[in-house]
Amino acid sequence: ITNTALNNGVKGYSRLEACNKGNVITLSDTIGGSPVFYQEKDFIGFAHLKMLIPKKNTLPDFDGLVGRYIAVSIRKSISGRYNYTTKLNTGNILRTKISLPCKDGLVDTDFIRKIMTEEQKRSAGLVLDYLRSFSEQ
């Protein structure tokens, strides 16, 4: 995983053993744009790649749906604020604020999963409609 803002940060694949655990959010402190992604699988990370690792006591049921939701929330929060000159360094990462749905003072992961599942279904429907438009021609 590199600091690119493309392809979920994936630069390539290796047969070497992964040195970073998956189920984390990665971001870069060296480029502009919004290179914030959820990484499901263990990976090898390049220099300047930062990882946000969920705390088990705060988000015990952190998974891909919750991770992608939080990554998008971070991406929206930092959009347009950082570039090659103004870096998204550790201090700026720690000061970044995002809004998450809460219930009883905790992040409402059930609600997040519901929203993300509905969005996946909607997106899949759009892709199917698009593909069907070709078969009807």
Indicate residue ranges for each PLM-predicted region.
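Charged, alpha-helix-forming regions
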Residues: 2-137
